[in-house]
Amino acid sequence: MAKRKAVRKKVVKKNIARGICHISASFNNTLVTITDEMGNMIAWSSAGSLGFKGSKKSTPFAAQAAVEDAVAKAQVHGVKELGIKVQGPGSGRETATKAVGGIEGIRVTFMKDVTPLPHNGCRAPKRRRV
């Protein structure tokens, strides 16, 4: 019986000049998604997908590496301007936003914190006693 070859999708190069970098920094991981202005995904990366495991995923260095990887993938599609939307309380927030600004060939147009805050909604989980 013949072996089947793994079918891989061919990456179609898009020509997008502006995008939005969505950084979701949780306590356990940092997710970076780059979309166009309509919200269609161009590239993504995360600390876990780059090989960081366990508690190393939540470090600022892992967040910086995830941002650099996602922006490098987006630059293939012609992205030159990025807006930044940050969500979550994670330790990689500040490092990730600085990493976007430090990449050569990328101009940051805006920065916005889009962390959802309840106006006294659901009851919060009980505090941990460590």
UniProtKB/Swiss-Prot annotation:
Q: Which family does it belong to?
A: Belongs to the universal ribosomal protein uS11 family.
Q: Which UniProt keywords apply?
A: Ribonucleoprotein, Ribosomal protein, RNA-binding, rRNA-binding
Q: What does this protein do?
A: Located on the platform of the 30S subunit, it bridges several disparate RNA helices of the 16S rRNA. Forms part of the Shine-Dalgarno cleft in the 70S ribosome.
Q: Which organism is it from?
A: Sulfurimonas denitrificans (strain ATCC 33889 / DSM 1251) (Thiomicrospira denitrificans (strain ATCC 33889 / DSM 1251))
The record describes its quaternary structure and partners as: Part of the 30S ribosomal subunit. Interacts with proteins S7 and S18. Binds to IF-3.
Disulfide feature: none
A Gene Ontology term for the protein's cellular component: ribonucleoprotein complex
Question: Which gene is this protein's source?
Answer: rpsK
PANTHER family, per this entry?
A: 40S RIBOSOMAL PROTEIN S14/30S RIBOSOMAL PROTEIN S11
The record's listing under InterPro entries reads: Ribosomal_uS11, Ribosomal_uS11_bac-type, Ribosomal_uS11_sf
A biological-process GO annotation: translation
GO molecular function terms noted in the UniProt entry: rRNA binding; structural constituent of ribosome
Q: What protein name applies here?
A: Small ribosomal subunit protein uS11
